[in-house]
From Swiss-Prot:
SUPFAM superfamilies linked: Protein kinase-like (PK-like)
Region listing for Disordered, in residue ranges: 18-401, 722-784
Function in brief: Plays multiple roles in cell cycle progression, cytokinesis and apoptosis. Involved in pre-mRNA splicing in a kinase activity-dependent manner. May act as a negative regulator of normal cell cycle progression.
Annotated protein name in UniProt: Cyclin-dependent kinase 11B
InterPro entries attached to this UniProt entry: CDK, CDK11/PITSLRE_STKc, Kinase-like_dom_sf, Prot_kinase_dom, Ser/Thr_kinase_AS
Compositional bias (Acidic residues): 290-353, 372-381
Family from the record: Belongs to the protein kinase superfamily. CMGC Ser/Thr protein kinase family. CDC2/CDKX subfamily.
Activity regulation, free text: Phosphorylation at Thr-437 or Tyr-438 inactivates the enzyme, while phosphorylation at Thr-584 activates it.
EC number assigned by the record: 2.7.11.22
Keyword Metal-binding appears in the UniProt entry: no
Biased composition (Basic residues): 95-113
Organism placement in taxonomy: Eukaryota, Metazoa, Chordata, Craniata, Vertebrata
Cellular component terms (Gene Ontology): cyclin-dependent protein kinase holoenzyme complex; nucleoplasm; nucleus
Enzyme class: transferase
Length: 784
């Protein structure tokens, strides 16, 4: 039964009809055969028993006929037996029971097929319902997502509008701050301008008062001579003096009051200055002066300070007119008025002289010897309060006192800039390092902090002509260009006299030139890249601040034990601007000088420093100068031989250079620079070298683009500065004579080389036995 269930399948209507047709044909054949067999048996029957036996055998034969077996095999077992049509008289009871079982099985199968079809339909419907449910779920999710996106867009729009509103508010606040700052700056400028004008007017008034005091002194001397001798020469003076002392003086005072109202703002500005000057004048007076006289003098000075130039000129003109009109007054009135006016003028002149002898410039700490002499003069003044000239028994100074005008003229203009500077006595000299472009450098120790510093003494051979412009440029430039790769200035110190000025800088152990002279092996490619990156960073900072160094070379590049490179020696540095101005072409040491300078160009810019950087690049790789020329012509020929002779095509404006117009140069058609480096320089490195050494300054690479070059990003990469090897500091040893490197240009100033012998008798010198070469000594030996 199990096999039948497993092999059962539902037949189609066509299959059932075909099966019925086939079975009908088989039944017809079987009937024909049965009839034939029955005829044969009838003909062979002999007796009843045999017939019975034959009938029984025939029944067995019919029951077990081969047709039935074949039919059962073809129709797959019992299924075909149930479909076979048998004569009713031949079916036994067992077969009927079997037939009923088959009918039941078929009924079950039909029921099962119907239930299977119903289950299939149910599954299909369930799938459809599941599909619908999923579809609705997806639609709900899409709707929720779209709603979330709309909400997100609205939030983003609100956030954007809020940020935009905040940005606009910040911009508005920034503009408001800038506007207020501009207003404040404008007010400050106006205030400074008002103060400056008030100061100028005050100085002019003081100068006029000094001139008028001088004139009154001369008139007083003339009046004294007239009283002693010839009385006939004095009739012209009384009317003027009476005019000054009489009723006609009142309108002049009223005029001063009006002008004081007009110049009230200037009085407020300079009020503190007048108070300090009046206090100094009162302290400088003789001991017999009382407090009442000091108050009267202050009032007179305020009245005189409030008058303008126009009022004084009008007063003088009126006095001259009155002198001409009243030329015939009596001798008695002239004597009385002359005595009164002379007394007043004497007191006023003494006050002004006392005022002018007091210097407003405060005393500096490094010039104490001059302070002692001033104290001596003050003591002498106190001993003789009422006498303008010393007596025979009094102390007479070595040098006569100078007039106030002469003192102001001789006062150096750079003195206020050096107020508060420490003395060089506070440093202990250890040894001499090197002589720079415009000064000598020493290694010294700060006695207070025990720090090792570098002291550079500025050359002051021509101090009589004023402070050297090169020293001013160096100090100004080096203070303005502070950077990790530029030497750090700590302070300015002075010696006993104003002609000894020192720049105190952080001490750096090596300079590249002396270091490469002692190195057995050249720098590694990674070390060269690190040095070049630091050099380009320092040069970029200078150029960004509109500064030309104009003397870049290996001896001016310092290297510390920490691997930090610093650019030094700003003796030739200067600021430049746009448009370019004509500068001197005699700058930069010969070996590092750009071709445009060698050919006489006067307008140049940062490209001259970049050419020097390229020369330093080649020297770091080979430990030898790239173009070691012996003269300007030899330098040009060496450059042309390695880089090829330029032309107007590769260097626009080449034919217009002064040297090109005057002479012709050898023709070198090819660039042979690559052969000099070989494996020391990669293709990217040679490309950078060519960009540094480009003939046309307008196409020469700048420091910023040089830092971005691919040469610094290829292997081997630049090493960390802290990984640099250390060498013994040559500057801490006894100074060795420098090699054959040429000296930098001196700019036509004719400075001589400054040695230790030049330092003697000039404020300090090194206490060593050997002259010229300075070893470590006990310190400075100063003379005041």
């Amino acid at each position: 039964m199990g096999d039948e269930k497993d092999s059962w399948k539902v037949k189609t209507l066509d299959e059932i009809l075909q099966e019925k047709k086939r079975r009908k044909e088989q039944e017809e054949k079987a009937e024909i055969k049965r009839l034939k067999n029955s005829d044969d048996r009838d003909s062979k029957r002999d007796s009843l028993e045999e017939g019975e036996l034959r009938d029984h055998r025939m029944e067995i034969t019919i029951r077990n006929s081969p047709y039935r077996r074949e039919d059962s095999m073809e129709d797959r077992g019992e299924e075909d037996d149930s479909l076979a049509i048998k004569p009713p008289q031949q079916m036994s009871r067992k077969e009927k029971a079997h037939h009923r079982k088959d009918e039941k099985r078929k009924e079950k199968r039909r029921h099962r097929s119907h239930s299977a079809e119903g289950g299939k339909h149910a599954r299909v419907k369930e799938k459809e319902r599941e599909h619908e449910r999923r579809k609705r779920h997806r639609e709900e999710q899409d709707k929720a997502r779209r709603e979330w996106e709309r909400q997100k867009r609205r939030e983003m729009a609100r956030e954007h509008s809020r940020r935009e509103r905040d940005r606009l508010e910040q911009l508005e606040r920034k503009r408001e701050r800038e506007r207020k700052l501009r207003e404040q700056q404008k007010e400050q400028r106006e205030q400074k301008e008002r103060e400056r004008r008030a100061e100028e007017r005050r100085k002019e008034r003081e100068a006029r008062r000094e001139v008028s005091a001088h004139h009154r002194t001369m008139r007083e001397e003339y009046s004294d001579k007239g009283k002693v001798g010839h009385w006939s020469r004095s009739p012209l003076r009384p009317p003027r003096e009476r005019f000054e002392m009489g009723d006609n003086r009142k309108p002049v005072k009223e005029e001063k009051v009006e002008e004081r109202d007009l110049l009230s703002d200037l009085q407020d500005i300079s009020d503190s200055e007048r108070k300090t000057s009046s206090a100094e004048s009162s302290s400088a007076e003789s001991g017999s002066g009382s407090e009442e006289e000091e108050e009267e003098e202050e009032e007179e000075e305020e009245e005189e300070g409030s008058t303008s130039e126009e009022s004084e000129e009008e007063e003088e003109e009126e006095e001259e007119e009155e002198e001409e009109e009243t030329g015939s007054n009596s001798e008695e009135a002239s004597e009385q008025s002359a005595e009164e006016v002379s007394d007043e003028e004497m007191s006023e002149d003494e006050d002004r002289e006392n005022e002018n002898h007091i210097l407003v410039v405060p005393e500096s700490r490094f010039d104490r010897d001059s302070g002692d002499s001033e104290e001596g003069e003050e003591e002498v003044g106190e001993g003789t309060p009422q006498s303008s000239a010393p007596t025979e028994g009094d102390y007479v100074p070595d040098s006569p006192a100078l007039s106030p005008i002469e003192l102001k003229q001789e006062l150096p203009k750079y003195l206020p800039a050096l107020q508060g500077c420490r003395s060089v006595e506070e440093f202990q000299c250890l040894n001499r390092i090197e002589e720079g472009t415009y000064g000598v450098v020493y290694r010294a120790k700060d006695k207070k902090t025990d720090e090792i510093v570098a002291l550079k003494r500025l050359k002051m051979e021509k101090e009589k002509e004023g402070f050297p412009i090169t020293s001013l440029r160096e100090i100004n430039t080096i203070l303005k260009a502070q950077h990790p790769n530029i030497v750090t200035v700590r302070e300015i110190v002075v010696g006993s006299n104003m002609d000894k000025i020192y720049i105190v800088m952080n001490y750096v152990e090596h300079d590249l030139k002396s270091l490469m002279e002692t190195m057995k092996q050249p720098f590694l490619p990674g070390e060269v890249k690190t040095l070049m990156i630091q050099l380009l960073s320092g040069v970029k900072h200078l150029h960004d601040n509109w500064i030309l160094h104009r003397d870049l070379k290996t001896s001016n590049l310092l290297l510390s034990h920490a691997g930090i490179l610093k650019v030094g020696d700003f003796g030739l540095a200067r600021e430049y601007g746009s448009p370019l101005k004509a500068y001197t072409p005699v700058v930069v040491t010969l070996w590092y000088r750009a071709p445009e300078l060698l050919l006489g160009a006067k307008e140049y810019s940062t490209a001259v420093d970049m050419w020097s950087v390229g020369c330093i690049f080649g020297e770091l790789l080979t430990q030898k100068p790239l173009f070691p020329g012996k003269s300007d012509i030899d330098q040009i020929n060496k450059i042309f031989k390695d880089l090829g002779t330029p032309s107007e095509k590769i260097w626009p404006g080449y034919n217009d250079l002064p040297a090109v117009k005057k002479m012709t140069f050898s023709e070198y058609p090819y660039n042979n620079l690559r052969k000099r480096f070989g494996a020391l320089l990669s293709d990217q490195g040679f490309d950078l070298m060519n960009k540094f050494l480009t003939y046309y300054p307008g196409r020469r690479i700048n420091a910023e683009d040089g830092l971005k070059h691919e040469y610094f990003r290829e292997t081997p990469l630049p090493i960390d500065p802290s990984m640099f090897p250390t060498w013994p500091a040559k500057s801490e040893q006894q100074r060795v004579k420098r090699g054959t490197s040429p000296r930098p240009p001196e700019g036509g100033l004719g400075y001589s080389q400054l040695g230790d012998d030049d330092l003697k008798e000039t404020g300090f010198h090194l206490t060593t036995t050997n002259q010229g070469a300075s070893a470590a000594g006990p310190g400075f030996s100063l003379k005041f």
